Amino acid sequence: MSTNPNTPAPPASRTNPISLRIYKAIGTSFDDVSSREALEIASGMYGPEDPKAKVKAQPEYEELEEDDDTLPKRRTLKGQSAAIARKYLKQDIETCLATGSTKFLEAFAEVDQKLNVLREHMQEMQVRCDQVQSELDQANSGTKFLLERADVLRSQRDSAQLRAHLITLFLSRFTLSNSELTALTSREVTIGQPLFDALDHVEKIRTDCEVLLSGEEGKAQAGLDIMSLTSEQLESGYSKIHRYCQFEFRQFTREAQLEASSVMRQAICRLRDRPALLADAIQTLTSTRQSSILHQFLDALTRGGPGGLPRPIEIHAHDPTRYVGDMLAWVHQTTATEHEFLEGMFGVKEKKRWVGQERGGEEGEEERMASEVLDKDLEGLSRPLKLRIQETIKSQEGIIMTYKIANLLHFYLVTMRKTIGGKAMLVQTLQEIHDQAYIAFYETLDAQGRGLLRFLHPPDATLTPPITLRDAAQILRELLFVYSTSLIDPAERESDADLAKLLDKAVGPCVEMCERMAEMRRGKSGGGEWERDIFMVNSLGYLEHTLEMYDFTTKTLHMLDEKIKTHVESMTFEHHGKLLESCGLAAVMRTIRTRPEDTPLSRLHATSPKSLTSALSKFSTWISTVDPSTSPRLALLTSPRLAVEIHRKALRKIYDAYGEICERVLDKAEGYEFGETMLRRGRDEVGVALGVGEDWELEEDTEEKSMKQKEQQDEDTEDQGEKGIMQEEHKAQDAGNTEDKA
């Protein structure tokens, strides 16, 4: 019968001691380290005898042996280990424990003996320590005062060191070093960056000292002492800078030496904090530069440059424009050089403004100082320059030369005003000379106008502009040419008061002279208004042609054009009357204009059918002989355009008169029975014959434009010739000036 091992045992076996022991043995685990170690020790105690050992007679039981490790070692026979172990295990273990305890007791006895010896030594050492402590206590009680004194001295030393450190910091902050004091006070140390750094340090000390002044009484007194000391140091430093500036300013006597170093610029900048010292130093500079510039100007006038080049300015005293121009050019060049030097010395910031360019905006402190010094430097030039230019102006008799000098003065006045400002004394002097020059010019111009009106005579038979008018127009042309070269903005020339005054004084007497001469011609020859109008149109046209060369004479041209139009209208009216008489329609038109309203034209004598037929026959003959483009009566007009215009307007009025006559003849109310047969020519046919048909206005405008273009071309050719002559003259003068200046 087979039994399943997994089948649980019956309940009776669970109470069996053997079964329980077996289950206990089976269930016991010997995997832990301590159990294994115990088993290994036990197995070592009862191990079999080495077979290679010497064989002796063995008793029935084995004797107990002990090894060096106090563990019992029994010799067993082969196969008896387990039995011996079960028999003697408890006994052997107890024996082992007893043996081990004995050894421990022996060892502890020896240790106890050693500890007794150590205790004796410790007791002896304790006695010695007590003696030392007693002596130490006696020493401490004897040196207590010294220790306390040492602690007090140590604390005092630390306090003194702290105070010394604070004093060192205080002195380093509120006093100057030896090198800084030397830089401020010693004459052997030159002006430089160390001096400026020392001044900055003094200023910083004074700023920091304000904290002390607002503190306690002791601190406030220290602050006052520091402020007093630093004030003396500052004054010493500024005095040194002041002496340096005065010395350097006295060296600026020649143009080659005009160069301001960075140290000089910074020194002047520092002296601004002491206005009195700066003013005194600048006074030295202005007196030095004023004297130097004046001597240079006199040398340029009388001695010329080094080696004789350029030549002395007074050599050209015979040429007024060059003489005055050279003096003003020298002054302007010197002004530019001096202005550049002063701007560099005073540290004016660069604003990209060229010399002569207009000054803009508010000036800074540096620019104001530079302008004031420049004004004083150039002050010495005012008197000699003024005397020489005034003498030159007074010696001139020609109006052109006087105006050239005045215009030259105006050019440099505008330039200098933009460079150094209008308040400078030199500019005011130039303004005074400029005003005097213009006064002299206007006086000469007035004298010329009075001369034109003093000796008048009737125009000649050609009715051309008189020679006096031509001379005056030539002078006016040259004056306007000089004016066109001025610095006045072209957009402002039309409103320039000086130009208006010039044109009024130059053109007014000419027009008045022509009007008086025309009246004399009318009274002498009996030509009436016709010759007067022709002479006035020719003369005014000549003046107008003179002014047309320049675009800034619009107002005067408009005035002359209005006068010319008035005379042209008068001539047109008179010419129409003459043509109306010659064509035979004058009596007819007078009757039409003056007839009673209730009377037909056919019943009036001048417009009766017979008289009207005769008049129309004469008109038909006249129209075949008349020249529609010009008339011999207008041959004396110097302007072909105006002659054609007057003639064509008169013919147009003839055409209109003939048209009105045709309307009256064809009107049944006028009483003409055969009106169509009376009119030999139609209205359009007359218009074509006279050249004044329906398209007359368009043709007239076209012809007028062509005539104007032709006249303008002729005038431009003449103007170019005259301008070329004037430009050649000016070029020749400029070439001479350039050659001498070279």
Curated annotation (Swiss-Prot):
Chain intervals with Basic and acidic residues compositional bias: 720-742
Record carries keyword Membrane: yes
Annotated InterPro entries: COG6, COG6_C, COG6_N
Composition-biased stretches (Acidic residues): 694-703
Keyword flag Protein transport: yes
Region Disordered, annotated ranges: 692-742
GO cellular component assignments: Golgi membrane; Golgi transport complex
Top-level taxon of the source organism: Eukaryota
Compartment annotation: Golgi apparatus membrane
Function: Acts as a component of the peripheral membrane COG complex that is involved in intra-Golgi protein trafficking. COG is located at the cis-Golgi, and regulates tethering of retrograde intra-Golgi vesicles and possibly a number of other membrane trafficking events.
Family: Belongs to the COG6 family.
Protein name, per record: Conserved oligomeric Golgi complex subunit 6
Organism of origin: Cryptococcus neoformans var. neoformans serotype D (strain JEC21 / ATCC MYA-565)
Lineage, uppermost ranks: Eukaryota, Fungi, Dikarya, Basidiomycota, Agaricomycotina
Gene, per the UniProt record: COG6
